């Protein structure tokens, strides 16, 4: 299988030094809990209506697939490669609770390793709060050990029409948001 081939090669050092970290599990939290799939087990997993639901939850009926992913990554990843959980919407207080719970659950399980949390960092110029960013980043650092911004971007303000007349002002707003974030 691809899994055996890749991890067999990784264990033999073929990819040494190529990666500093692995995104082991991505986007497994919704609200303050795990994403689940409440659709009948008799249904095909490729049904479009599953949407944001987790097909793996559909198979396992628990968070064990997340634990196993980190267990296998810990077993096969080179020890110098950091293992990440990565998610979006991470500045929302409710989602922060769910993400911290996932991190704590993984770290408490036997045979796992989780070194860092990846904040996808999709923000809006209109609603970005450096204070909120700092608050949740500190919670993630306490739970995971390290935090990384993995996909940082700022959506333009709702009033921006992409015309040349307002472009400089909009770019200034975006630059200011970046400054606030890095000063937090």
Where are these regions (language model features)?
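Aromatic-lined carbohydrate-recognition surfaces of secreted/lumenal glycan-active proteins
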Residues: 19-26, 58-61, 65-96, 147-152
């Amino acid at each position: 299988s691809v899994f055996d081939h890749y991890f067999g090669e990784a264990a033999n050092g073929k990819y040494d030094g190529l990666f500093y970290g692995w995104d082991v599990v991505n986007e497994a939290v919704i609200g303050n809990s795990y994403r689940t799939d409440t659709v009948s087990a008799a249904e095909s997993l490729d049904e479009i209506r599953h949407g944001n639901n987790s097909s793996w939850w559909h198979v396992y009926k628990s968070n064990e697939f997340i634990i196993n992913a980190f267990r296998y990554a810990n077993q096969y990843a080179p020890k110098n490669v950091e293992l990440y959980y990565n998610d979006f919407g991470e500045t929302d207080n409710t989602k922060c609770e769910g993400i911290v719970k996932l991190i704590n659950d993984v770290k408490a399980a036997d045979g796992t390793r989780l070194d860092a949390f990846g904040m996808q960092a999709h923000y809006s110029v209109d609603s970005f709060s450096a204070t909120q960013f700092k608050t949740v980043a500190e919670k993630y650092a306490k739970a995971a050990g390290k935090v990384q911004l993995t996909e940082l971007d700022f959506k333009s303000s709702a009033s921006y029409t992409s015309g040349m007349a307002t472009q400089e002002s909009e770019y200034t707003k975006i630059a200011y948001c970046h400054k606030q974030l890095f000063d937090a």
